Amino acid sequence: MYRVAIVGRPNVGKSSLFNRIIGKRKAIVEDIPGVTRDRIVSTAEWRGVTFEVVDTGGYIESDKDTFAPYIRKQIEKELELSDAFILVVDGKEGLTPADKEIARILHRTDKPVYVAVNKIDNPEMEKAIYEFYELGFEKVFPVSSIQKYGVADLLDAVVQDIPEYEREASKEVGEKEEKSDVIKVAIVGKPNAGKSSLLNAILGEERAVVSEIPGTTRDVVDTLFEWKDQKFLFLDTAGLRKKSKVDYGIEFFSIGRTLDAIKKADVIVHVIDAQQGATEQDTKIAHLIQKYTKPAVIVINKIDTVPPKSEVLNRIKNQVRERLYFIPYAPIVMTSAKNRKGIKQLLKEITDVYNQSWKRVGTGQLNRAIKQILSLRQPPSYHGKPLKIYYATQLEGKPPCFLLFVNHPEGFKEHFLRFLENNLRTVLGFEKAPIKLLLRGKEERRD
């Protein structure tokens, strides 16, 4: 999604303008320099176009404020992530050295910059904007974020400069999903793979009843757990009660419970018995993970039941990876729930996978990555004509979803899209997250 960062020195009204643009009070606003310390991200809609808005912390020249280097780093990071910038300055106070310093940083990029001269709430005050042309940007607007004055003109200019493909992509965007502090984790797997034992090993207590009989956990088990300041809500899928009056068989209910859990969870932990390796039923479960594009961690459990030799463990791991080849992004962790081995590594992987599933990349970064990948391998021709990818953008929400504008969507075959997907994961840092590619047809312009 097109990303616009609001930058400026402390106490010029960045957060007030941010709240005005998104239409709700999300950033804390006080008359104290530097109240907003962290970047706050939200979506906005103007003239039917949806885009992302970032409220950065106030840029501070002096390092006397302990937050100054951090805030400066946040702004400089936005130079890469954002597609455009609104530089907010104070029309009453006038041009300052700090404003010039921020402008100097913004001139490093060739991306659009709009200067919002804030605290101008009537036409008589508009003459105050002229000195700000000294910053070297053409688009300077008098605004009052409190009184709404001039904000419409500013947003009209921003939206007018959004590329056509980003406007089209914004039509695909639904409600923005907020990242939760709690990771919902579904532990899935065929009966007796060790799901409840694994949960107990994580919790360090006998929370779920365990025996050697498949499906012995009868009650719903939703358990909140915290590790290294990260909260997890574990959903032990074996805990959903089986219908007592209808005997459809264990596998029927196992798959049914798994499907519900996969839809609900943020991260799936797919537990596989080390003695059996990946079975046909494990393949069915993994296909559900793939179908719903869910982040996942594959756990090869019960390694205490196989010879503790590296060649044996590698053979098991390779068998699982080969059979579940269609979810290559899911990291594999080898555990012994009985001996509590591999538990810390599992929790780390769950956290990494979750964070990657929320990762966003800027439009420029994405298109540079695609250009780099296409230099390695061009898409095949279609009906004698070359297939082309004109540009791409990341849509809102998770899992990461990229909309590609191409000339012939039907010509892009699965093997090439898989090549593109795998390389995008590597280049953009989504190695542990599933990504989706959507294709939209677009005619090539002829000038």
Swiss-Prot record:
Instruction: Tell me where in this chain the EngA-type G domain is found.
Output: 2-166, 183-358
Give every KH-like domain span. Answer: 359-443
Record's keyword terms, sorted: GTP-binding, Nucleotide-binding, Repeat, Ribosome biogenesis
Keyword set includes Nucleotide-binding:
yes
Q: Summarize the protein's role.
A: GTPase that plays an essential role in the late steps of ribosome biogenesis.
Q: Which family does it belong to?
A: Belongs to the TRAFAC class TrmE-Era-EngA-EngB-Septin-like GTPase superfamily. EngA (Der) GTPase family.
Return the protein name. GTPase Der
**From which organism does this entry originate?**
Persephonella marina (strain DSM 14350 / EX-H1)
Please name the taxonomic classification of the source: Bacteria, Pseudomonadati, Aquificota, Aquificia, Aquificales
Gene expressing this chain = der
